[in-house]
């Protein structure tokens, strides 16, 4: 980032920590399968930091596997590793959907949580915790920041709020 660049995001580390903590505590879990995003990605690293902090804070064990933000890859990871874990935490909703489908296929129940708050989560039979980013507010703030930069202002980092939600089918239908 430089003087002419503004970065707008949520606190990726804290958001991952928050949604995983809620899911872990709601179901009294101790053994975590964390399905991370793309190897060496900034968002992946930030979210993994949140998970490592949670593991330390709550004295959990965690296995980390790459899911590449892919539903199919996450499904395969869950098929291979979820059986001996108490919870599956995913770095994206799409991966959470893949992991949940794997658990359904194996006929086992494990809580699963995602990240992003995508509409598709509302179509999954089980409601999962996820992080909702207020893209309207983020977009509005981005327009304000562009205007400021165009008028000689300096760039800076802007951290926007996030929330933990469950996506329900009834909330997404018209």
Give the positions of each predicted feature.
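Flexible loop/turn connectors
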Residues: 83-87, 91-174
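Conserved acidic residues
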Residues: 5, 30, 86-87
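Phosphate/pyrophosphate-binding loops at sites that engage ATP/ADP/AMP, CoA/4′-phosphopantetheine
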Residues: 26-27, 80-83
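A generic structural signal for alpha->beta connector loops
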Residues: 4, 59-61, 109, 127
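A short acidic, helix-capping loop that chelates divalent metal ions and anchors anionic groups
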Residues: 2-6, 121-124
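Hinge/beta->alpha junction and helix N-cap segments in small-molecule ligand-binding domains
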Residues: 7-18, 34-56, 60-77, 90-97, ...
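Nucleotide donor/acceptor-binding cores
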Residues: 21-32
């Amino acid at each position: 980032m430089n003087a002419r660049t503004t970065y707008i995001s949520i606190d990726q580390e804290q958001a991952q920590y928050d949604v995983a903590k809620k899911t872990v505590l709601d179901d009294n879990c101790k053994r975590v399968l964390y399905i991370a995003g793309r190897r060496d990605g900034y968002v992946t690293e930030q979210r993994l930091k949140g998970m490592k902090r949670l593991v330390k804070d709550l004295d959990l064990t965690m296995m980390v596997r790459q899911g590449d933000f892919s539903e199919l890859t996450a499904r395969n990871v869950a098929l291979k590793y979820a059986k001996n874990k108490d919870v599956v935490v995913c770095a994206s909703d799409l991966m959470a959907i893949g992991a949940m489908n794997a658990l359904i296929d194996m006929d086992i129940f494990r809580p699963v949580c995602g990240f992003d708050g995508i509409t598709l989560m509302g179509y999954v039979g089980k409601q999962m915790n996820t992080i909702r980013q207020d893209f309207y507010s983020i977009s509005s703030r981005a327009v304000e920041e562009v205007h400021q930069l165009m008028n000689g202002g300096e760039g800076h980092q802007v951290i926007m709020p996030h929330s933990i939600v469950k996506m329900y089918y009834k909330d997404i239908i018209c």
